[in-house]
Amino acid sequence: ILSSPNALQDFHTKALEDYGITAFWPEAVLKEAKVKKENIAREKDILETFPFVTIDGEDAKDFDDAIFCKFSDTGFHLKVAIADVSFYVKEGSALDLEAAKRTTSVYMPKKVVPMLPEKLSNELCSLQPNKRRRCLCIEIDFDKDGHIKSYKFHRGIIKSVARLTYTEVENQLINGVEDSKYAGSLKAAIALFNKLIINKGYRGALDFTISEPFLQTTADGDIKHIDDRKRLNSHKLIEEFMLAANISAADFISQYAKEGVYRNHEYPESLKIQRLSQILKNRGINWNGSIEDIENISAFILKLNKREDAPILNMLILQSMQRAEYSTLNKGHFGLKFDKYTHFTSPIRLSLIHISEPT
């Protein structure tokens, strides 16, 4: 199928058919999505005074999150603004039921089948630059070593000052932050990120070196070749900030919410660990899969990354882990090394997040 003249279009058609994904919307959903342009000009919000930015891929249109960071007397202050989808998608509405049915946006090469109609996903809910957008904001205070000291949630309105790409931010990470409205925020964000990465290592969180393939296509949609997408430090910066927001949300749910959804990742199963140990032994690698070995597996992965076959070994170890699952019961997250964890930072493209959202 990938060798045909219309390979990409054929792939899209077959993938949608095979997985029962529809690109069409029921009339009731489209009707609800035609939200009258609301007048929020009179609503003033202190959040608008902060130079929030979004950092996403070059092709992104649904901007779920925006960040602002600054140095504080005690360390760092981070604000993470998350698109307030629940303002437009009411519980039990046609939009809500359709999102629950789809569960997630589907991303394919050069095509996205959104969970919500584009009027919402790419416009009203998307934290576009220079446009006032409703959000759920979490403000997190860190000490000088990057440990969370306190947090608070509140709804508000932001006006992002820039739509940045991972490549643009990576260049500034390497060459220095450029003069801009957000320069001070980005400098503080980089400093906080460096602390969080150190803490991640101390925590023993898993960090696999696995490339992500993506298709390079012509303007007509013909496939030229398949490349490996490199994971940049700018990706990791946003990942770490979203992790901080998500563990704060999980803590909030555990303390104050009557119910909520956690993202659990349980301890590896013994049979899979035994198989992994044997495979590694066949490759001349001594790893017994003891409790001590498993607890220190992140350090083991770092050693393996010096080998030529590191990508293969990373994949083998990943396949030996249990799959992360959602549950109303908290069981902790083995891979991230968190006592509790949830997802609430991608509401435009993941329906379950609406249940986990702190309110």
Feature map (PLM): residue ranges:
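Charge-lined substrate channels and their catalytic hotspots, especially those that engage the 3′ end
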Residues: I1-I82, S86-C135, R163, E168-E170
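Conserved catalytic alpha/beta cores of large enzymes that bind or transform nucleotide phosphates
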Residues: V106-Y202
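Conserved nucleotide-binding/hydrolysis micro-motifs of P-loop NTPases
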Residues: V85-F87, K144-G146, Y267-E269
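Short, surface-exposed charged micro-motifs
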Residues: A66-F68, E139, F214-Q216
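Append "with occasional cross-activation on large, charged helical scaffolds in nucleic-acid assemblies
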Residues: F153, Y166-S356
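Short, small-residue-biased leader/transition segments that mark boundaries at the very start
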Residues: R133, E357-T359
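Short acidic-glycine loop/turn motifs at beta-strand connectors
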Residues: F71-D73, F142-H147, T217-G221
